[in-house]
A protein has these predicted regions:
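Aliphatic-rich helix starts adjacent to a transmembrane/signal segment
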Residues: 1-38
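Low-complexity, Gly/Pro-rich coil/beta segments used as flexible assembly/activation regions
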Residues: 34-169
Length: 169
């Protein structure tokens, strides 16, 4: 009788440990994904709103040609500017549009200085930038805000989305 009770107890403990090991691995990957997202978001948030925005964002580009006008007011115009092929050359938020690095992308996962990231094997980073419309009260211009969606795909295939808006200020 004691052997049967002991066998049942050991089976239950073994299953519990197995489940904790599996969930612990997922938690570890999620933590690494969040660290990776924080790194990319910090890098992107530090950039200017637009190619024609001054460093610091004041005064904002105003969407008119010449002077301090924004470069374009359409989603088709977003993405790296001419000559900005490497992330180290990106100088405004929309340069990151369509960035795709890491596992399955064909591009290495890099840090802000262009060095290959270690410890993030099988992670993938994708960035989409779009105009988010008039979310700022100063005008009806489509160029008031850009929406940045950062997607981190973990080794298990689960994707985490991180979103922020960059205002034209």
């Amino acid at each position: 009788v004691v052997i049967v009770i002991l066998a049942i107890a050991l089976t239950a403990v073994t299953q519990m440990i197995g489940q904790n090991t599996i969930s612990g691995a997922y938690t570890y990957d999620e933590t690494k994904a969040i660290e990776l997202a924080q790194s990319y978001l910090g890098e992107i948030k530090a950039k200017r709103y637009d190619e024609n925005s001054p460093v610091g964002g004041v005064p904002p580009c105003d969407g008119v040609s010449g002077g301090n006008g924004c470069t374009a007011n359409s989603n088709a115009a977003l993405g790296p500017d001419t000559g900005e092929l490497a992330r180290t050359a990106f100088d405004d938020v929309d340069d990151y549009d369509d960035l795709d690095e890491g596992s399955g992308s064909g591009n290495a996962l890099l840090d802000a200085e262009g060095n290959t990231r270690t410890g993030y094997e099988n992670f993938r980073v994708q960035v989409q930038v779009t105009y988010s419309g008039n979310v700022a009260p100063r005008s009806g211009s489509v160029s008031d805000s850009k929406k940045v969606v950062l997607t981190i795909t973990q080794p298990n295939g689960e994707a985490l989305d991180f979103t922020f808006h960059r205002a034209n200020y």
